[in-house]
Amino acid sequence: MALIVNIEKTLGDFHLKVNFTAEREVMALLGASGCGKSMTLGCIAGIVRPDKGHIELNGRVLFDSEKKIDLPPQKRKVGCLFQQYALFPHMTVEQNIRAGAHARPKNEREQAVREVLHAFRLEGLENNRPSQLSGGQQQRCALARILVGQPELVLLDEPFSALDAYLKWQVELELSDILKNFSCGTLFVTHNRDEVYRLCDTVCVLNKGKSDPKETVKNLFRAPATMGAALISGCKNVSAAEVKQDGTLFCKDWNVTLKTALNVPENTAYVGIRAHYFTTDGAENAIPCTVERVVENPFSTVVMLQTTGAGRLRWELDKAVWETLSGTEKLTLYVRPEDVMPLTE
C-alpha cells in the first residue's frame, strides 16, 4: 500500500496544510483537538474537498486539483470507522456486514460475509441488532463491514473516544489483534499518545493544521523534532533555548546551560525534558531548584519546582523515592545529556 497526501484546505481562519506518505503500516495522525486530523481523513475519504493538492493511493489518483480529478467516496476503495461506528440500527449483524460487500462480485458476497463473521468472532451473533451487542462486538461488526469490501486503506477516526476506560482497554486489545491480521494500510486519528504508542508503527504530528515529517513512534517519544511534537507526546518541561558556540544549550526559562547528546539543528529554539528524566544524583547538567508544590497521584508523586529563572519544572517520580526526600526545600536535579531534547518551532 502506498498513500501520498499533499493538500491544503482553508475553512474560515483555519488553514490545513499536510504532506505525508504512508506504506502498509498503522500510521497515526496525532494532534490536539481542532488541529485538522479529522478534516484530513475527510479529504482522503472524499467527504471533504481540498482547495488544492494531490491524493494518491496505490498509483490511483483520488484527487488532483490541477488535473481536476476528484473521485467520489465509493470509488476510492477507502473504508472509514468513525467514533460511533455508524451501524444501521434496524439491521442485524449479518445485514450490516452484507451492506459493506456490495462492491464485490455477486457470486463472492455470501462467502465473503461468512469469512469475516468467522474472522471477527461474530458467529452466533448474526441475527442480533447493534443495540444487543457490547462495545467490542459493535466495533468488530463495524470493522467487518469495512473489510468485507476489500478496501486498500482503512481510516479510524478516534474509535475509542466514546468508551469508558475499562471497555476502551478491551476494545483496543481487540482492534490491535485485528489490525495485525489484515494487510491493508491504516490511518489512525487520535489525540491520545498512549494509543499511538501501543497501536501504531509510525506517526505524523499535526499542529495547528500543519503536519510535521512522519517518524517512527519510538523516535517521537525518544527524540521529537519540534516543540509541538514534544508537547503532544507528553513532554511537560519546555524552555526557550539558545544554541551556544560549543554546542550546549542555554535554557532561558530555567537559567541553566545544558549539554545534549542528541543532534542540535541550527534552528533549535527550545529544549524539552520529560518529567521522569530527572534524578538527584549525577555528574552533568545540574539544575538548582526550590520545591514549590507536591501533588500525590495514586502511584507516583509530582513535584513542581521553581528554577533560578522565570520557569518551573515538573518532576514525576516513584512515591517511595519522594518519601526519602520529603521535607526538602532546596534540590539540585540532574538530567543525562541523552535526555535533553533540542526542539525546533
Q: Locations of the language-model features?
A:
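A position-specific signal in ABC ATPase nucleotide-binding domains
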Residues: 48-49, 56, 86, 102
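ABC ATPase nucleotide-binding domains
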Residues: 77, 92-228
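C-terminal boundary and immediately downstream tail of ABC-type ATPase nucleotide-binding domains
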Residues: 221-244, 272
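Conserved ABC transporter NBD signature motif
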Residues: 53-65
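The short alpha-helix immediately C-terminal to the Walker A/P-loop
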Residues: 42-43, 202
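Catalytic "switch" loops of ABC-type ATPases
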Residues: 47, 78, 82-88, 192
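Non-catalytic connector elements of ABC transporters
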Residues: 5-32, 38-39, 46-49, 60-61, ...
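ABC ATPase nucleotide-binding domain helices that frame the ATP-binding cleft
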Residues: 38-41, 141
